[in-house]
């Protein structure tokens, strides 16, 4: 590693080739377009080079890595290197058949995941997170982190990664998760912003009963059920159903 790592970018680069190979093996053979967020100097990228790939987009915020990436992949015509912050990009222009792969920076994992999910048209993602963060995502209990993305994706934990597989080593283990787009989403894309407001309102008071939260926010409780439960006691379908029943009032209050 010849480039100085920057703490502000939360850089921990995967250098274990066996793990990189396992990650690539999660990519279906039919995939021809890949977007990698945060390639660094290409440790994982090297394993994504394949005869099936027609387009490989590398999005790297740190300009210090560009000379290495440009030199390393200058002869590969299907690679596009973009020096930009993923948080400032319009992802709608990318083909929904593309697969997103990333070892997401630990310090902005949540923000990047929300950003990607706001487009929610990608068929599949393979993402690495800190193990504790990953456990919250795959938890069977609803929480403020997982309830929106589970409306659009099936999430599966594939394997854990030792902290020794990275440079510099993070403090805890990581996990690789796959996200596969549901055939039938539980929400429409235009519900995302309003549902995000709703879930935040509920989960910021997660220890309180739903009835208490709704009364506090002056919602009508007529024809609503399961109000004596807490948010984490709902299953996903019940929670979405509650949102849809309250949607007219939510629109009036927050739109």
What are these model-predicted stretches?
Residues 1-201, 241-244, 253-255:
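Catalytic cores of RNA-modifying enzymes
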């Amino acid at each position: 590693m010849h480039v100085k790592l920057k703490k502000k970018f939360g850089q921990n680069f995967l250098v274990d080739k066996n793990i990189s190979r396992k990650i690539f093996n999660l990519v279906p053979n039919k995939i021809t377009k890949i977007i990698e967020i945060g390639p660094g100097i290409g440790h994982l990228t090297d394993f994504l080079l394949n005869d099936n790939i027609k387009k490989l987009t590398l999005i790297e915020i740190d300009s210090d890595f560009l000379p290495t990436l440009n030199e390393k992949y200058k002869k590969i015509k299907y690679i596009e290197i973009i020096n930009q912050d993923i948080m400032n990009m319009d992802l709608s222009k990318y083909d929904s058949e593309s697969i997103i792969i990333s070892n997401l920076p630990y310090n902005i994992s949540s923000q990047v995941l929300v950003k990607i999910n706001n487009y929610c048209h990608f068929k599949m993602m393979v993402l690495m997170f800190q193990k504790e963060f990953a456990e919250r995502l795959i938890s069977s209990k609803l929480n403020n982190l997982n309830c929106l993305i589970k409306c659009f994706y099936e999430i599966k934990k594939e394997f854990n990664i030792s902290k020794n597989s990275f440079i510099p080593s993070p403090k805890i283990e990581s996990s690789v998760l796959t996200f596969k787009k549901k055939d039938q989403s539980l929400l429409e894309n235009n519900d995302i912003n309003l549902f995000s407001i709703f879930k935040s309102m509920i989960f910021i008071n997660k220890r309180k009963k739903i009835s208490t939260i709704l009364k506090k926010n002056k919602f009508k409780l007529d024809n609503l059920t399961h109000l004596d439960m807490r948010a984490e006691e709902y299953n996903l379908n019940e929670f979405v159903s509650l949102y849809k029943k309250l949607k007219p009032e939510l629109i009036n209050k927050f739109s």
